[in-house]
Design a protein with these regions (language model features):
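Charged helix-capping and loop-helix junction motifs
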Residues: 11-19, 49-54
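Catalytic His-Asp segment of secreted/periplasmic serine-dependent ester chemistry enzymes
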Residues: 38-111
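Active-site segments of SGNH/GDSL-like serine hydrolases
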Residues: 2-6, 21-52
Length: 111
């Protein structure tokens, strides 16, 4: 998703592509959707596209009774209190990945 956004694709395109992947994965078993992470510096307003995709994914997940791991909010909140969670514009650093792992574990333990 994020790579498509960085290449200038809009939220509708990214969402439809991700839904195709979700539907394919669901034929193999339980699916959990991990929301896209923020784009750290909001390059050219691209973080807005990430947020739009995530809102669409949340609605899809709710309609299809699929669990969601909200990686976006996890990293956004850490970033807002001054934690350095990115190793560049898009990829989390060690702390960011650790926070994401904790969030995933929180969701997995409630299955």
């Amino acid at each position: 998703g994020t790579n498509d956004i960085l290449q200038g694709r809009d939220s509708t395109y990214v969402y439809k592509t991700l839904v195709k992947a979700i539907e394919l994965a669901s034929t193999k078993g339980t699916v959990i959707i991990g929301l896209e992470t923020q784009i750290d510096s909001d390059m050219d307003g691209l973080d807005l596209v990430v947020r739009e995709v995530n809102e669409q994914l949340k609605a899809y997940a709710e309609a299809h009774n699929i669990k969601v791991i909200d990686f976006y909010t996890t990293l956004f909140e850490a970033d807002q209190i001054g934690q350095i969670v990115f190793a560049g514009e898009v990829h989390p650093n060690e702390r960011g990945y650790r926070l994401m792992a904790y969030k995933a574990l929180e969701v997995f333990t409630r299955l």
